[in-house]
Amino acid sequence: MQTLHVELGERRYPIFIGSQLDPKQLLEPYIHGQQVMIVSNVTVAPLYLSHYQEALESLGKTVATCILPDGEKYKDIQHLNLIFDALLEAGFNRDCTVLALGGGVIGDMAGFASACFQRGVYFVQVPTTLLSQVDSSVGGKTGINHPLGKNMLGAFQQPQVVLADMAQLNTLPERELSAGLAEVIKYALLGDEDFLVWLEENMDGLVARDADLLAEAVYRSCAHKARIVANDEKEQGERALLNLGHTFGHAIESYLGYGTWLHGEAVATGMVMAADLSQRLGWISNEDVARTKKIIQRANLPISCPQIPLDDFLGHMAHDKKVLNGQLRLVLLKQLGQAVITKDFDVELMKQAILANQHG
């Protein structure tokens, strides 16, 4: 087992990364109070809920559960309310803990619920997908979608602890595994070319679910994110770099309808668009773009999206949270392994990059 810490002063917390982790031993120091609400979904609960419920009950905790439907399209205010209903019906108090057992949607919703319930209760993350292990479970961003934009309602809510168990990735559908690899590739492209080389050498093993390689990929990804979050928790500056591919990707997700494409799939094509625009600006080479596309394809991810009318695409981009004073800011590549956030780009070139990476 490997341990990383997200350094946030007195709110410092550990990320435990390994296979067949013992929840009783690892969670005991971090569960405050006697009441624990496990939030999961209909896919994950039959696989792992009893394991965590029994571990917590053996610690003398009162455990209640809230099982939600599975999917991004349920990440809304109506389903968030089901968590509040469960907490209130169980009579839980402000000293309770909300434990997220699932992927990014469950983590986002359970975290947001924990930030709101009685103005804030304790929160624990047990991410069961690769994407949530390397991205959404680390750093405290929680929230839900609104019909007009993704993650428009939310709060920063740091967990007490994160448990990333590689054994749980064995039950992950192939498409979900690939979606997680998109975020892993993102860390390499935005800040670590050595990691990109490692991914190029080990992508076949990652796709084949080699537990040691997955643990190394999760560790390196989380270490990268933890460093950025420690420097910029509330995304005032450097943390925005973690949105490489996301402005384009969110537009794809929003237009197609949440859940039609997985988040990681949309981000993958978004990173291709960002690389394409970076090349059109003269920042990276054609070879760099080809290298970006190749590693994304090797992870069984899309490098183009269905045709989306340009006005619709741009309209969805305009709802992005990185819009500042009416100006769209994009995360682009100065070179592979070095990203920047900028508003200094030619909009016509951006349109070309969008259109060039769609298929009929």
Swiss-Prot record:
Its main location: cytoplasm. SUPFAM superfamilies: Dehydroquinate synthase-like. Pathway: Metabolic intermediate biosynthesis; chorismate biosynthesis; chorismate from D-erythrose 4-phosphate and phosphoenolpyruvate: step 2/7. Catalyzes the conversion of 3-deoxy-D-arabino-heptulosonate 7-phosphate (DAHP) to dehydroquinate (DHQ). Binds 1 divalent metal cation per subunit. Can use either Co(2+) or Zn(2+). Pfam families: DHQ_synthase (PF01761), DHQS_C (PF24621). Zn(2+) binds at E183, H246, H263. NAD(+) binds at residues 70-75, 104-108, 128-129, 141, 150. This is 3-dehydroquinate synthase. GO terms for biological process: amino acid biosynthetic process; aromatic amino acid family biosynthetic process; chorismate biosynthetic process. Keywords: Amino-acid biosynthesis, Aromatic amino acid biosynthesis, Cobalt, Cytoplasm, Lyase, Metal-binding, NAD, Nucleotide-binding, Zinc. One of its GO terms (molecular function) is 3-dehydroquinate synthase activity. Its cofactor is Co(2+); Zn(2+); NAD(+). It comes from Acinetobacter baumannii (strain SDF). Disulfide bonds: none annotated. Belongs to the sugar phosphate cyclases superfamily. Dehydroquinate synthase family. It is an enzyme of class 4 (lyase). Gene3D superfamilies: 3.40.50.1970, Dehydroquinate synthase-like - alpha domain (1.20.1090.10). It is found in: Cytoplasm. It catalyses: 7-phospho-2-dehydro-3-deoxy-D-arabino-heptonate = 3-dehydroquinate + phosphate. Its EC number is 4.2.3.4. GO terms for cellular component: cytoplasm.
